[in-house]
Amino acid sequence: MAYYYQNLWIENVNADEGKFTVYNENFFRPSDYASLDICVSVNGKPRYNNGDIDIDGIAPQSRKTFTRPALASKIKELKAENPKAEVTVEFYFKSKHGEPLIDKGQTLAKYQSVAQSYTYPELTAAVDGNAPKVIETDSYVKMEANGVAVTVGKYSGWIDYLDINGKEMLVERESIEPDFWRAPTDNDYGAELQKKFGVWKNPGYQVTSVSHEAVGNSHVVKANIKMDNVKGELAMTYTLKADGTILVNQDFRATKDAKVAEMFKFGMQLQMPEQFNAIEYYGRGPVENYSDRHSSEFIGAYTADVADEYFEYVRPQESGNHTDVRSFKVYDKRTGEGLLFESDAPMQCSAINYLTEDLDDGPSKYGKKWGRHSGDLTPRHLTAVHILKYQIGLACVNSWGAWPLPEYRLPYKDYSFSFTIKKTK
């Protein structure tokens, strides 16, 4: 809200020319109370700062265009040095002298522009090395390569075990599973989405086939799963490459003309042991954000403790999400061991110490306990990780009860998501 209420804006950025326009949206106040700092970042890490730019003399409701040759030169240099990296330009308007309730140097307004787009990895790229070893039994297919062991259950269709250098990456008896449901937010309850989308809480999984084959120096396991409750089918493909990279493909096929509710999420979820207590990600942060609530959070490189990722809303609900994520690492701060998730397009990711069921009050927000608060929650001794292609927005188009705008919803149709899992050490 503060972002869209700000009164100073950047427009018409031409990074290669170091050119931009400042718009003073104030109705009665000239721009003399603020100065402008500019930062240039490469893959979210600051590499250049041009501070204290004088923007005096811009009248209310007026614009002024600036050209900074030094800025243009630095941007061109960084782009040439980092041809596949994302180069962004951050603009910060800061209080020049301070005033009541505002400190000198405090940020009053901000804006981010992309000078060079991110180059996403090619997920299917070939790697060198020996083909994985494979063990098959009546109940599972196990693949091993470069210290990574992946076990796909024939009865579940999921990755039931994931070990790296002999260390278990998943909580015992918990699998890497699809993620379609979220703990309803206050706005969800207002629109009764917890009832309207309820079928996605238990889609009704039934494995119809599991097969596997060698493809070059990789090995591929395919699981086909019926989802009768939502009249769809899920095809899961797990590829273990020679270097230990796991490629996960999640393909949902909807039944044409079927009348099925929209979904909250599309992606995967897993539970990691509690020692994996930190995250490092390149995406929007550091504050949680959602598809229709993310403009104020800049794309950058961030680190955080998992324990701090749940925001204590008055009552428990979905929390901790980050959008436009390029890479997401969950790791043990002591050893650096953990998992790195990447995709070929932006993801939405989170890692908190609560399961969705801990935050979900059911069909009524008073279903579990009248007046339940976030302070009543007890963190679990695990890290719940969500790796998503999509999650619907938070809505609140009116004060309460409206659905998210159409572009921030997930109607019933086909969806596909691919991402990789790599060991961090």
Where are these regions (language model features)?
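Beta-strand/loop-rich accessory regions of lumenal/periplasmic or secreted enzymes
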Residues: 73, 77, 82, 118-425
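Carbohydrate-binding surfaces of carbohydrate-active enzymes
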Residues: 1-154
